[in-house]
Structure formats: C-alpha cells, structure tokens
C-alpha cells in the first residue's frame, strides 16, 4: 500500500483497499494457512473451527478423518472452594509472618470425596469425536484454512478436496465430500476413551449413549452428567454433505435434526468473516511468519469469542476428547484470560468482550461475599485468580486465591473497553461499581508506612510458586502497578461521569509507591556486562534473580502503563530493569509470556528483539499444525518443555496483540507508531486500528516515511 500526501486521496485509497482486502485478504500470499497431513500427533495439530460455543479440530491421516468436538460450557460444577472467614487478610499476614506454614496452607484446603482423584474442584469435560472413514483408497495429504472466509479444504492424494465450513448463525459444522468418494461417520464419545475408567467413572459418570444408525444417515450420542444438564452431539449426512451439531438439555440428540446444508453454512461463514475483518484491524508486514501469526491468530480469537457465545477459558472451545484438560480449563485471571481477550482492543472487536464482562459482573454477590470474609468490608469485590464459569474458586493455590490484581486487571479491562467503545452507559450502570468495589479491597489491605502507604503482603504471580516464604512479600510491584492503574482509571471515570473522585484514590496516587525499587541490580561479571543500575524489584528487597515466565514486576510498563518515564529517575530505573530482565534470559519461560516479552521490547524501542520474540514463539511453542502450547514443543529456547500435552489460547491471542503493538503502542498514554518495526522493514502498514480515545486509525511506513490518518 503506497502512502499518499493528500488526506482525501488517502481516505479514498483506504476505502478501496478495504474492499480489496475483503475479497482477497492475502497477507503476503493468498491468505490461506496450510497443514501437511497426516496430522496424527494430537487434535491440536488440526484445522480449528468454532462458532463461539462448539469447537471442532480437524485432524487425522491416511483414510481416517477425525473431528474432535468440544464445548466451551462443558463443566462439571461439583466442588470448589468457598471463601471462609478464616481466610481473612489479617490472619493470612499474621500466619505468614509467624512462619506458620501448615496453618496457613490449611486455610486453603478442602476435602475431596473418596475415589475423586485430585483436588475437589470444578473442571471442564471432554465431549467426543466423529471419526470419518474414507473409501476407495482415499488418502489425506494436506489441508488449508482461509482466515478471511472461515472455509477449509482437505486435499486427497488424487487431487480431490473435502470442503469444510462452520457457521456462527446456524451453530453447525459441515463437510462436503467430492464426487465418487464414499465416507462413513462414526461417533466416539469421550466415555469410550481411557479417561472414562481412569477419571470419570470414579466420579459418578455414566457412559454416553450412542445412537449411530438408528435412523439412516444419522448418528451421535447423548451424555447424562451427574450434576449438570446433559450434553449431546448429532450428525446428519445426505449425499455428499454431512452436518455436525452439539447442544445441551434434556431433549435427546435423536430429536435434533441438522437442518442446514453445506451451501447455507458456507455462505454464512463467508458473510460473517467478511464483516469481522471489515470491522476490525488488519496489518501488512513483510515477514510471512508474523503475517500468518496475525491472520490465523485473529481468526481463532474471533472464532472462540463470539459476542453471542460462551466466554473463553484457557483453551476456548477446543477441548481434547480423550482426557481432562489441564488446569481444569478454567478462567485464569492473573494474565491468561487477559491475553486471550487482548486482541479485542487494538483489534476493534469490542463486542467480543461483553460475554466475559457480563459473566464476571453476574458473580458480584459471590465476589462481595469474598471481600467481606477477606477484609471485613461490605462494599468490596474479591476475585480469585482461578474460577469456573460461576465464579467458584478453583482452589489449592493459596497465593493465586489472594492475588487481588486479578480483580484489578479485569476492572481496568472494563474501563479500557469504556474508553475504546465510548460506552458511558455501561460505565454508569455496571463498570464504575465494579471498579470501586475492587479498589475498596485494596484500600482495606493498605497500611501506613512512614508517611507513605504500603501493601503488607501479596503475591507476584508464579514467583517461587510453592515456596511458602518467598512466593509473597511486601509491596509486590505487580500489585502496586495494578492498584495505581485502578486508581487512575477511577479518577478518570469519575470525571467522565461528572463526579468528584474519592479522596482515597487521590491519596493512593500520592503516597503508594509505583514499584518496589532496589538499590542496584546485580548479576553477571564485569567482563560479561554486569548490570549495576537501579531497577524494579519483585517485592521490597527481592529482585529478579533468575529467568521468570511472568514479567509481573514490569507490569507498570505493560500492560498497565503507570510508570511515567519523565519523572525523577524512572527512565534510568526502567533501563536497569530491562537490562537485568534481559540478563536473566528465557530459560524458564512458557509460551504465553513470549508475546508479552515482545511488547516489552517494543516499549524499550528494541524492534529487532520485539520481532524476534514473536518468531521464537511461533518456532518453539507452536506445533506443525499451528497449535499454541504452554510448554515448548522444541528444545533450545527454554527448559520448560514437557511435550505437546498442554494447549492454551493465551499465547496465540497475545501474539496477535504483540503484532499490533509493533505498529501502535502507548507510552505514558501517548501513542507511538511503528516503534516495534525494524528499520529493514521498508514497507509496513496497518488499517482500522482502534485507539483508547475512541478513534480508528490507519497508517503506513514506506522507506522510513511514516503517515497516519483517522479512519472514523
């Protein structure tokens, strides 16, 4: 895209360019993401489809096509941890200071039923798969998926293709087989796999009832759950077409006849994704890896976060069909949910945030009770870092339960939405109350400290996780940054609503430290570039002394942007912090933290490292089928490698956000354009990117010349 000097010409060209994008949407080639078959390692190597409730992963090999089908609302809601009066903040601080490890940990235990196997917590359930046997010697060779239409293809050795589509309108997945290729679907519920005998049967589950073949051309199964409404899967085939649907409720799946045909589902998919890309941000980068990371990642974000769908947890709707998903498939609020939803902001897909926000706000009675027991107030909200879709604490990790930045981060997300979308009514009716209640908990935690305020005790996420003494400390920089972000947002929100800000919020801004500061950062030898300047600590007196996957002590840089670079020695402190962080390296990193690192490099003005981090994320944490993993798939970048068993969507969505941040990034509230784009990128551009002031902008950098203009 060529930059034009005159704004009128630029606007016309952008309109034309948007039309071209909707038709072609090529990225750096034809826009299609490719797969080589066989893909038999695990389901996450497959092509991904979703309608925001049901997820389908298409994989397999030879003459066997596998459709792993999951649902984002498949919970066994039994168990969980209710907040107790003994889990009050004063008691926790006192026990920790006294070294009473067993007493403190005992506050956060519950008793599981006999034969339960593991902690007594809610968890997400697998649903099952449909296995399609191809006839006539057909062999799968490769697959493609177009992120701009949502349509996929599977290629056979003879050149024929199986077409794939999923519709958010019809809530159905469809296949169209080529002429002359016979196919035979078979239903395989999760209860037919080893997970049933090992984990589900001891917990009181019955086997799903399969009804394949009772009606010609139809099949599926229904599954009665011990404590939740039943689930079902059904498929119907006619001629060359086969349609798969899922649902919940007492009505048997046999009664659910798929009515849509492939043509309808195909056209609905194309129409939906055309609107999605027209409404949101688009980029052009000269790096084919990053172009694919953005295009396919934004597609998967849009697929799993439908405005009329179910809020996405760690894996969205893409759950394995033969095991219980890692970490219960829960909502992790100490970074993971935030990363999953981060593309909504710069990407301009604000409506995709609303199911998440409405779910959290529906928990307010429970969160208020949590705050009452945690710190003795009637007007607070306390959100544990790990919960199910009803806000029930998934317990066992005490530092996560008391991590109040989980609530503060979501409050800041809600206010960020208000700024981007201009939704003052939502601020007035819901968000402002949640922000105030969240701040009230912080205010109850604070204590006087020689004329300043302090947080007596708190966690820095995942720092020394199981170490009773070292996992928490005084004035965690992560908590300080979250508290300041919330205070500033509340002050701004009050102004927006025509109210006077609470004096206590102003006091937080004046007297609470922005971060815990070390006298110096030590490490390495003089010969190898020892870092000796001052920097940000994890806690008071505790610096970053090893590789760490949660860059929480730098949260005041990103995501909270609370550290003013021009204030006092802050610039030097940030330089020392960045140098020490670089020194500690990537040896204990996991997938979701690498895109965050890219954004931190962008913030520091290190464009080469920002881009390289995203390439490393793709190279080390994604499998051959572009599945996003928690642990490294390949050696050489980190020691956190346990194979391909843990898929999470946080890294993939955060990578999309990091690509946008290469081009549009805020420092001290001021937007910097192309800060993360290397000089050797001679032509790079973005379209329709959203800013916090409600504007949409497009821009380009051609041969070093930057031009940016408003879109609407």
Mark where each language-model region is:
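Bacterial N-terminal signal peptides that target proteins for export
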Residues: 1-9
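Bacterial N-terminal signal peptides
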Residues: 8-19
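Acidic/polar, glycine-enriched structural segments that form the non-catalytic walls/loops
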Residues: 23-330, 349-354, 360-369, 498, ...
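Active-site core of glycosidic bond-cleaving carbohydrate-active enzymes
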Residues: 78, 84, 333-369, 399-424, ...
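Catalytic cores of secreted or luminal carbohydrate-active enzymes
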Residues: 112-135, 649-692, 696
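A conserved hydrophobic secondary-structure block that centers on an alpha-helix together
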Residues: 158-163, 167-172, 411-441
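Short, well-ordered beta-strand segments enriched in hydrophobic/aromatic residues
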Residues: 173-179, 483, 697-699, 706-711
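The feature captures the catalytic groove of carbohydrate-active enzymes
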Residues: 316-330, 378-428, 443-506, 707
């Amino acid at each position: 895209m060529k930059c034009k000097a005159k704004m009128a010409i630029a606007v016309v060209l952008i309109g034309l360019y948007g039309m071209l994008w909707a038709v072609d949407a090529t990225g750096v080639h034809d826009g299609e993401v490719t797969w080589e078959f066989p893909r038999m390692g695990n389901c996450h190597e497959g092509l991904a489809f979703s309608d925001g409730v049901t997820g389908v992963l298409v994989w397999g090999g030879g003459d066997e096509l596998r459709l792993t089908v999951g649902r984002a609302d498949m919970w066994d809601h039994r168990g969980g941890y209710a907040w107790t009066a003994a889990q009050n903040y004063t008691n926790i601080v006192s026990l920790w200071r006294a070294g009473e490890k067993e007493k403190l940990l005992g506050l956060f235990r519950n008793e599981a039923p006999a034969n339960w196997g593991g902690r007594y917590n809610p968890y997400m359930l697998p649903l099952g798969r449909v296995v399609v046997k191809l006839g006539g010697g057909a062999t799968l060779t490769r697959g493609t998926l177009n992120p701009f239409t949502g349509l996929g293809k599977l290629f056979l050795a003879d050149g024929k293709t199986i077409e794939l589509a999923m519709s958010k309108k019809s809530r159905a997945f469809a296949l169209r087989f080529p002429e002359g290729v016979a196919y035979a679907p078979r239903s395989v519920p999760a209860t037919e796999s080893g997970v049933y005998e090992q984990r589900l049967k001891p917990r009181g589950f019955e086997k799903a009832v399969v009804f394949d073949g009772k009606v010609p051309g139809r099949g599926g199964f229904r599954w009665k759950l011990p404590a939740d409404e039943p689930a079902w899967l059904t498929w119907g085939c006619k001629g060359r077409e086969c349609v798969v649907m899922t649902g919940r409720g007492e009505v048997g799946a046999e009664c659910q006849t798929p009515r849509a045909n492939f043509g309808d589902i195909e056209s609905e998919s194309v129409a939906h994704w055309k609107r999605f890309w027209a409404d949101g941000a688009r980029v052009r980068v000269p790096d084919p890896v990053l172009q694919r990371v953005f295009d396919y990642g934004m597609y998967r974000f849009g697929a799993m976060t439908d405005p009329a769908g179910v809020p996405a947890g760690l894996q969205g709707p893409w759950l394995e069909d033969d095991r219980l998903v890692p970490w219960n498939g829960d909502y992790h609020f100490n970074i993971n949910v935030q990363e999953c939803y981060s593309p909504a902001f710069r990407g301009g897909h604000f409506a995709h945030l609303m199911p998440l926000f409405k779910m959290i706000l529906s928990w307010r009675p429970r969160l208020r009770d949590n705050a009452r027991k945690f710190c003795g107030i009637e007007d607070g909200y306390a959100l544990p870092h790990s919960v199910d879709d009803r806000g029930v604490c998934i317990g066992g990790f005490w530092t996560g339960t008391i991590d109040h930045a989980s609530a503060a981060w979501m409050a800041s997300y809600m206010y960020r939405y208000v700024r981007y979308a201009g939704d003052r009514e939502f601020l007035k009716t819901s968000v402002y109350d949640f922000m105030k209640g969240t701040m009230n908990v912080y205010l109850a935690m604070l204590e006087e400290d020689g004329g300043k305020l302090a947080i007596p005790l708190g966690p820095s996420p995942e720092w020394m996780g199981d170490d009773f003494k070292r996992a928490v400390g005084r004035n965690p920089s992560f908590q300080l940054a979250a508290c300041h972000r919330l205070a500033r947002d509340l002050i701004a929100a009050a102004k927006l609503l025509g109210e006077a800000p609470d004096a206590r919020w102003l006091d937080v801004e004046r007297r609470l430290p922005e971060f815990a500061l070390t006298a110096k950062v030590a490490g390495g030898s003089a010969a190898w570039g020892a870092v000796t300047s001052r920097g940000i600590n994890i806690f008071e007196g505790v610096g970053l002394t090893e590789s760490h996957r949660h860059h929480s002590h730098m949260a005041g840089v990103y995501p909270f942007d609370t550290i003013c670079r021009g204030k006092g020695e802050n610039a030097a402190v940030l330089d020392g912090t960045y140098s020490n962080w670089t020194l500690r390296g990537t040896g204990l990193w996991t997938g979701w933290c690498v895109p965050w690192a890219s954004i931190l490099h962008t913030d520091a003005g290190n464009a080469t490292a920002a881009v390289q981090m995203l390439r490393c994320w793709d190279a080390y944490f994604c499998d051959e089928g572009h599945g996003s993993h928690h642990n490294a798939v390949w050696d050489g970048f980190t020691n956190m490698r346990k194979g391909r068993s843990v898929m999470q969507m946080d890294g993939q969505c955060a990578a999309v956000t990091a690509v946008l941040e290469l081009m549009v990034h805020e420092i001290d509230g001021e937007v910097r354009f192309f800060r993360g784009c290397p000089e050797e990128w001679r032509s790079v551009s973005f379209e329709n990117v959203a800013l916090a002031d409600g504007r949409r902008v497009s821009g380009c950098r051609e041969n070093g010349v930057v031009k940016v203009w408003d879109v609407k």
